[in-house]
Each structure stands twice: as C-alpha cells, then as structure tokens.
C-alpha cells in the first residue's frame, strides 16, 4: 500500500473520529483537534503492544503490521510535519515525549523506535511520590513545544502513584495566507447560531478571486498558505452547508462518502460576489480515550494483553494499560493567517454533485467545518467546527 493510499484511509478514520467527537463530546460548541496527533500516540502504543491490543489498533488505523505503521508514521513525521519556516513556508513543529516511572525501563528496541521513527525523547519520572510535579513537567513541555499556545494538556489529577507511563504529542502550526486579508476591510456582521440566535462577529473579506466550488447542498473554500521552497502546500478548507443548520447533515455526508475530502477540493479560482469569513480563536480539549472506546478501540484501555513490547519487565508489561489519551488543541484565524496547536497525552497506569458557476457567493455566516491539509499528500493536520466565532 503506497503512502497516498494509506493517507486516504487515515483521513476516513480521522473524519469518523471527528463525527464521534462532535456528536458525543461537543455538538453545540466549537471543536478543534488534530487527528495527526492522536494517530501518532496510537501508533506508539501499537508499537509497544502485542496480541489483541496490537491487532485492534492496527485494524482501527487500517494497517496490516506495526512495521508498515511505523514506517508510515516515520515518513509523515519527517516529511510532512517538518518545519518549513526557514525556507519561507509555515512554521511547523511536532514533538513526541515519553515519561516512564523510575521503577521501569523501556526495552532498548522500543526506546530506539521512539527515537528513530517518532523523534520522541524519553524521560524517567517519579510517579510514586511526585506525580503532581510530573504533570507540571509534561504541561510545561507541551507549552514550550506549542509556542505557549497550550499550557495544560494533562488536567490536574490525571496522574497519580499508580501511573507508570505517559506519552505526549504536541503539534504547532503557524501559516501565513498566500493572499493576506486587508484588515481595513474587516467589518462586523451577523453570525447565525445553531439555536436560531445571532451574534455580531468580525468578518474578513476580499475582492480577489478565490478557490471556491459549489456542490449539492454545500460549498467549499480553500485558502492556501504561503508556500516555502519545498514541495509541500498547506491549505485551510471551509466546508459550508447551504442551510444555516446543515452542519450535522454535511458531516454525515462526509463520513459516509469514501474519499470525500480528496474529491471536493476547489481546483480553480473564481470570482466571488459576496465573500465573508469570520475571524475566530478558540481552544478545545477532550479525553480521546472515551471517543476511541466508543468507536470500538477497547483493548489498549482494558489491559487484556498488556503492553509487553514496551518495558523490560514482562510481568509488569502484562499489567500495563492505557488509562487516558488527553488531547488539547487551539486555533486562531485572522487576516494574516492561522495559528494552531494540538497536544495529546496518553496516560498508562497499572491495572487496579459538482455545479460550476462563473460567480458565486461564499458567506460563512453560519456554522461550518474546517480542515487544515497538506495538499500534495492529503495529510489532515486539524479538523474542527465553528458554531460561534466569538467563543
């Protein structure tokens, strides 16, 4: 299976995850998360698992072996998620970290995989007597790696004396629009909420041609980021239902249509009569383990087979399971571009149709979905929904 095919399958997993997050965690509020971040943490857990746990994660992520998964993840980390700011592209930073209790040690083969494939730093920690300090250490690490955007990926009390292992992943993205918006043209306007009420929000606009396509029941806008000297091309896509309350139906359509994202990319610039998109800034956090369990990924959290390929002690490995995968992301969209960050931490404890028009409108004055994608590979960095640009 080639990388592009693998990514297409990953995107199906990501959109399914997005639907589950939105419907179970936060149907009526803004959502932003990074499927790329969550997939990296799951990949690391799979690499340290055996038996049913390994098989279930591989099946969930649609891979046939851990070797295939590791080489795919390694390629994504090094090729797609590499920083491009030095050559004029988006600032991108991905970091992985592992904290293991001082009573345990990683298997040398697993530690090497962490360092080589996932560029992950491993740290010893004293969970027995200093769990609070370890939480603070992980959070300050996430803050540093996300340029200060995320200050708390692990909530208070998320680790205790029973905790043996924490994996964390942080992803930071800052891109400048290829065509910046003129700040003097930004005006207040009405945004329609899901409950029928309205709020007044600042809307950006432009008279320039835009990458917009109209489909049956929705429109898609692509805003490209300034590209660096490498081949990567990042864009933010806005999926805007025609109906003010059409977000849920659009999400269903995206999830139930294989290859939806790849097949609904606006390829040409068109004249736009009325063009308005809101400015917004928000953060969103959730426990991804609950969502993953709801999607059938249960073995890593039950400790049936343990994480025997991670640690030197086979007996201790059998009793290790994942207790939580905490995820936090934030995003800001303004005239200059986008700043976004996400961090995930997995805590492991000891068991106790297309219509072409010459000119169209694109007025995002009601709830919409957004996706940040690398266009050459199709890798999805962030998925979200904006239901209220003020919150």
Curated annotation (Swiss-Prot):
UniProt region (RCL), positions on chain: 337-361
Tissue and organ expression note: Expressed in root tips. Expressed in siliques (at protein level).
Pfam families linked: Serpin (PF00079)
Effect of residue 351 to K: Slightly more efficient in metacaspase-9 inhibition
Glycosylation sites: 375
Coiled coil: none
The protein's name: Serpin-ZX
Subunit structure as annotated in this protein's UniProt entry: Interacts with RD21A.
Family named by the database record: Belongs to the serpin family.
Domain comment quoted from the record: The reactive center loop (RCL) extends out from the body of the protein and directs binding to the target protease. The protease cleaves the serpin at the reactive site within the RCL, establishing a covalent linkage between the carboxyl group of the serpin reactive site and the serine hydroxyl of the protease. The resulting inactive serpin-protease complex is highly stable.
GO molecular function: cysteine-type endopeptidase inhibitor activity; serine-type endopeptidase inhibitor activity
GO cellular component: apoplast; cytoplasm; extracellular space
Known role: Inhibits metacaspase-9 (MC9) cysteine protease. Functions through cleavage of its reactive center loop and covalent binding to MC9. Involved in the control of elicitor-stimulated programmed cell death (PCD). During infection by the necrotrophic fungal pathogen Botrytis cinerea, functions to protect cells by limiting the PCD-promoting protease RD21A activity that is released from the ER body or vacuole to the cytoplasm. Involved in the control of water stress-induced cell death by limiting the pro-death protease RD21A activity that is released from the vacuole to the cytoplasm.
Keywords: Apoplast, Cytoplasm, Glycoprotein, Protease inhibitor, Secreted, Serine protease inhibitor, Thiol protease inhibitor
Record-annotated site: Reactive bond: 351-352
Organism: Arabidopsis thaliana (Mouse-ear cress)
Disulfide bonds: none
Subcellular localization: Secreted, Extracellular space, Apoplast; Cytoplasm
């Amino acid at each position: 299976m080639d990388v592009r095919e693998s990514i297409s399958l990953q995107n199906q997993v990501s959109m399914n995850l997005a639907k589950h997050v939105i419907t179970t965690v936060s149907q009526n509020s803004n959502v932003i998360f990074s499927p790329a971040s969550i997939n990296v943490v799951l990949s690391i857990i799979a690499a340290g698992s055996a038996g049913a746990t390994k098989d279930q994660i591989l099946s969930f992520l649609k891979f046939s072996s851990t070797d295939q998964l590791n080489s795919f993840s390694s390629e994504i980390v090094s090729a797609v998620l590499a920083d491009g700011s030095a050559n004029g592209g988006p600032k991108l930073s991905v970091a992985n970290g592992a904290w293991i209790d001082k009573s345990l040690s990683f298997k040398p083969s697993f530690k090497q995989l962490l360092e080589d494939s996932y560029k992950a730093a491993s740290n010893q920690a004293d969970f027995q007597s200093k769990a609070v300090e370890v939480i603070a250490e992980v959070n300050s690490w996430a803050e540093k790696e996300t340029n200060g955007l995320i200050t708390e990926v692990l909530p208070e009390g998320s680790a205790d004396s029973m905790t043996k292992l924490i994996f964390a992943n942080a992803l930071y993205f800052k891109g400048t629009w290829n065509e910046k918006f003129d700040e003097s043209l930004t005006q207040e306007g009405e945004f329609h909420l899901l409950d029928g009420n309205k709020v007044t929000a600042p809307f950006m606009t432009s008279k320039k041609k835009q990458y917009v396509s109209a489909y049956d029941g929705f429109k898609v806008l692509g805003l490209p980021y300034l590209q660096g000297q490498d081949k990567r091309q990042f864009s933010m896509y806005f999926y805007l239902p025609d109906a003010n309350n059409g977000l849920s139906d659009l999400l269903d359509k995206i999830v139930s249509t294989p290859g939806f994202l790849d097949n609904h990319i606006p390829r040409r610039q068109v004249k736009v009569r009325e063009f308005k998109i809101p400015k917004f800034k928000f953060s969103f956090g959730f426990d991804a383990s609950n969502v993953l369990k709801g999607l059938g990924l249960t073995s890593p959290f039950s400790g049936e087979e343990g994480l025997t390929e991670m640690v030197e002690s086979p007996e201790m490995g059998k009793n290790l399971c994942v207790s939580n995968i905490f995820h936090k992301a934030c995003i800001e969209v303004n005239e200059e571009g986008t700043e976004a960050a996400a961090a995930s931490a997995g805590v492991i404890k000891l068991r106790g149709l297309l219509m072409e028009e010459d000119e169209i409108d694109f007025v995002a004055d009601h709830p919409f979905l957004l996706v940040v994608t690398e266009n050459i590979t199709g890798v999805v960095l962030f998925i979200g929904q904006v239901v209220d640009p003020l919150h």
